[in-house]
């Protein structure tokens, strides 16, 4: 099981992202893209803030969420109760006793980010072969003509928020290049009364859109829409 990068920071992280993401608006747009699909997989569900909004709008949906962070899943359990089936699993080794109509990720495993004029995939999974395997495992859990949606994120920009009179939460962003590979470095720092009380560093692998779509095609997922680079949608080939 990968290291839980958010252990000890999940409460602060939750408050920070609630202030910086309009989950109701994202949920409304996603539901339009879901159409009549019923069995949904959230890859990297985190604390469940997005799913909370989705099930308020579409309580009949059957949603399963996976994440590698036990601390974030604990918050998701408190938020969602028994409405969502939660699993502490790495998507690289995903094994669920269920097939899905649709899967999506918004930064929990992968997200697209706009780097000026270039669209890049930001992946929590760092090894290229492991990224390919994660795509394969999701595709294996999709029914024929099922869809994968990878959502764009603004997490590649720095941000600082005062959560209350004592606590400040900050995200700083940098890039690193190692032997031709590109990485996005996200540093989350929490200060209380000026003193540092928590710090987590998250490193994400960056890949060009064309390369990512070649990898997805290799597991039977072809691009059908990008909704102005906001929601990249891939569909699994049906049985011939």
Task: Kindly give the residue locations of the regions a language model identified.
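A short acidic, Gly/Pro-enriched loop at the edge of an enzyme's catalytic core
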Residues: 95-103
């Amino acid at each position: 099981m990968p290291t839980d990068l958010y252990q000890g920071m999940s409460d602060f992280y939750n408050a920070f992202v609630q202030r910086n993401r309009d989950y109701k608006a994202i949920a409304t747009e996603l539901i339009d893209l879901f159409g009549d699909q019923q069995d949904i997989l959230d890859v990297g569900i985190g604390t469940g803030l997005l799913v909370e909004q989705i099930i308020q709008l579409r309580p009949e949906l059957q949603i399963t969420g996976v994440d590698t962070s036990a601390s974030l899943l604990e918050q998701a359990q408190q938020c969602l109760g028994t409405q969502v089936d939660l699993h502490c699993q790495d998507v690289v080794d995903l094994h669920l006793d269920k097939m899905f109509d649709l899967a999506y990720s918004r930064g929990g495993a992968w997200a697209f980010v706009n780097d000026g004029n270039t669209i890049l995939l930001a992946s929590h999974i760092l090894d290229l072969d492991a990224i390919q395997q994660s795509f394969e495992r999701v595709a294996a859990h999709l029914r024929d003509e099922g869809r994968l949606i990878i959502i764009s994120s603004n997490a590649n920009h720095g941000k600082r928020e005062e959560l209350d009179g004592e606590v400040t939460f900050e995200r700083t962003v940098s890039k690193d290049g190692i032997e031709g590979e590109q990485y996005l470095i996200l540093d989350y720092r929490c200060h209380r009364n000026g003193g540092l009380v928590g710090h987590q560093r998250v490193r994400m692998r960056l890949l060009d859109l064309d390369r990512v779509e070649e990898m997805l095609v290799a597991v039977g997922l072809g691009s059908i829409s990008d909704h102005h680079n906001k929601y990249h949608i891939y569909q699994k080939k049906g049985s011939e």
